[in-house]
Design a protein with these regions (language model features):
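Residue-level detector of high-confidence beta-strand sites
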Residues: 27-29, 78, 147
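A short acidic/small-residue loop/turn micro-motif
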Residues: 31-33, 59, 83, 151-154
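ATP-binding/phosphotransfer module of carbohydrate and carboxylate kinases, centering on a glycine-rich
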Residues: 1-59, 69-72, 90-98, 115-121, ...
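A secondary-structure boundary/capping signal
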Residues: 9, 63-64, 79, 130
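A charged helix-plus-loop insertion that forms the helical arch/lid used to bind
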Residues: 73-85
Length: 287
């Protein structure tokens, strides 16, 4: 059976068709319609129909930003906010007249890296998304572990600082409000009064506030993932998303994590992803 996967991202929608040996047969990317749920449905439907033309025996998986409520089937906790409260899976199944498997982007990322990517040699893998948002997914023996209510791995909404920054989820102090890309940019602006994008910040090392900004980033990163290790003790942690390209996360960042873990022996591998920004779409294929 062929496998068709769709990755619904904040800026792009990617679809890929794989054969039984995971070879890419067809692939296409388009821009994501902004703040328009109906146009998102139409775009995904058109992509699926285009890539599945003349292919009748295929599974369909969708990778989406945000968790899916096990009770209601509605999207929740999504930073693509026009999806929140929507029955995306049901609406697409009705539109395409086909059964769909659907998981959030962090779960798809983790599954792809654990089955096809950098973490194929590990049994218990925690996949981390660090980008516009912060998320995570757990894979055990090449199978996703969703948890009782489909929120396993959602470390981005752990409380890092009580009464801290306000999060779009309605709570305060979430990890995401400290180490996501926009949060890091906001912190830089508070420190310096300058509005800069993250790539510029990372090279502005002569700024007198740069060391303070970096130190706070590393501390929050370390505390956040140390909590994950204390609870889950994974065989490996894989970093994905735009921030995974920051080299010091694998050196000073790893040291910051290890310093906070409750153990006298800490050797958890902190790995850079292998599949890049296509991990989501390959993970969708594997659902």
């Amino acid at each position: 059976m062929y496998k068709l996967g769709v990755d619904l991202g904040g800026t792009k929608i990617e679809a890929v068709l794989l054969d039984e040996n995971f070879n890419v047969i067809k692939r296409k990317r388009i821009l994501t319609p902004q703040n328009n749920y109906q146009k998102i449905l139409d775009s995904i439907s058109s992509l699926v129909k285009e890539l599945s033309e003349n292919t009748f025996d295929y599974s369909l998986g969708i990778c989406t930003p945000g968790a899916i409520s096990k009770q209601t089937g509605l999207i929740k906790n999504s930073n693509t906010q026009c999806l929140i409260g929507k029955s995306l899976k049901e609406d697409l199944e009705n539109k395409l007249d086909k059964k769909i498997s659907m998981e959030n982007d962090a779960n798809c990322f983790a599954l792809a890296e654990a089955t096809l990517g950098i973490a194929v040699d590990f049994d218990l893998v925690f996949g981390v998304i660090l980008g516009t948002g912060v998320g995570g997914g757990i894979v055990i023996n090449k199978k996703l572990y969703p948890g009782r209510t489909n929120i396993a791995g959602e470390w981005g909404h752990h409380t890092l600082h009580r009464n801290g920054n306000l999060c779009y989820c309605g709570k305060t102090g979430c990890v995401e409000t400290y180490i996501s890309g926009p949060s890091l940019e906001n912190n830089w602006t508070k420190l310096t009064g300058k509005s800069q994008h993250l790539p510029e910040i990372l090279t502005d090392i002569d700024n007198k506030y740069w060391v303070k900004w970096k130190t706070e980033f590393l501390e929050n990163f370390g505390y956040g993932l140390a909590n994950v290790i204390d609870i889950l003790d994974p065989d490996a942690i894989v970093l994905g998303g735009g921030l995974s390209n920051i080299d010091f996360l694998y050196t000073e960042g790893k040291e910051s994590i290890y310093n906070q873990v409750f153990s006298d022996l800490v050797d958890t591998p902190i790995l850079k992803n292998k599949l890049g920004d296509s991990a989501g779409v390959f993970g969708a294929c594997m659902l």
